[in-house]
């Protein structure tokens, strides 16, 4: 029997997708280390597994350059407090999950204090601000990438990186059952549905709720019997979306559901959604989609100068070609959205579905286990080899 002290992991997740990844990693680590302790910033899924949050995850859920600037004093206060708390804790490893503008600075400080650091989810250094890779190299002992082309970029710059695949590809079946999803959600078995996903952040709904609901009015002209369903991450976002509906399309009926975004996508015949992780989920569920995004004009002008790629949705980035329509900024209008959705709902989906299936295979690698193995390989020198049989 071992009398070693339990492993301690500090982690910071900045939004819903990070909470999902963090919970998967925690569960994989707990299989071989059931007494491990986890502390930092996490969401409800992580907390359900015993994670102790020092701050609410909502503190970090900020989008856009302008929006971040308005919250900067608070973000800096949170980061300074975390540096102090985590340094005193002396964890076996710190794992920053996504949120690169917050986490990489935190990792830099912690690594300088002798703490092992891992960044889970590569920042889009291949897409914009590529020189960030040099800061990442200084800040981390290892990057865990979700996408296959990212590792090649890190290898080129001699920065340690492990491609682990994506937990969504592990969790989502190759064939999503539309009938079962509709039964679960209480939706009509025979109706045609468009899922509308305007994002999980307040800033996203502020930008996208209006063009999305106005587009729905136009789509209804082309498909008089179509129905709309929208998953919203919490009551705050629901209130925000309901207000947009009241302001811009008071006669439009949209069935709103709290959470269950994956089930809503599986139940739909097509999807209109904000750019982000949800586009990957829509691809894995294998439904036709239109991707749209809009930020403040200043944020967009600054970001556009830094962009290194022409595509921004994950299905198109993974494929290296245009699989799904992308409507960004000035193209994110009700008219263009409605036209794109109409085209996607009318076209033969079989060729696109085959592309989605091939990409699903590439990403399905048991990501949480692979991530846990990579973390333990880094932690191992601090613990006896016998402590972690999964590393063998």
UniProtKB/Swiss-Prot annotation:
For this UniProt entry, the molecular function terms from Gene Ontology, in alphabetical order, are: lipid-A-disaccharide synthase activity; phospholipid binding
GO cellular component, as recorded: membrane
Quote the protein name from its UniProt record: Lipid-A-disaccharide synthase
Looking up HAMAP family in the UniProt record yields: LpxB (MF_00392)
Query: Which EC numbers characterise this protein's activity in its record?
Result: 2.4.1.182
Q: In which pathway does it act?
A: Bacterial outer membrane biogenesis; LPS lipid A biosynthesis
Q: Which family does it belong to?
A: Belongs to the LpxB family.
**What does the record give as the reaction this protein catalyses?**
a lipid X + a UDP-2-N,3-O-bis[(3R)-3-hydroxyacyl]-alpha-D-glucosamine = a lipid A disaccharide + UDP + H(+)
Alphabetized Pfam families for the sequence: LpxB
Give the UniProt record's GO annotations in the biological process aspect. Answer: lipid A biosynthetic process
Q: What does UniProt list as this organism's lineage?
A: Bacteria, Pseudomonadati, Pseudomonadota, Gammaproteobacteria, Alteromonadales
| NCBIfam families membership | lpxB
Swiss-Prot/TrEMBL keywords: Glycosyltransferase, Lipid A biosynthesis, Lipid biosynthesis, Lipid metabolism, Transferase
Q: Which InterPro entries match?
A: Glyco_trans_19 (IPR003835)
Presence of the UniProt keyword Glycosyltransferase in the record: yes
Q: What does this protein do?
A: Condensation of UDP-2,3-diacylglucosamine and 2,3-diacylglucosamine-1-phosphate to form lipid A disaccharide, a precursor of lipid A, a phosphorylated glycolipid that anchors the lipopolysaccharide to the outer membrane of the cell.
| CDD domains in the cross-refs | Glycosyltransferase_GTB-type
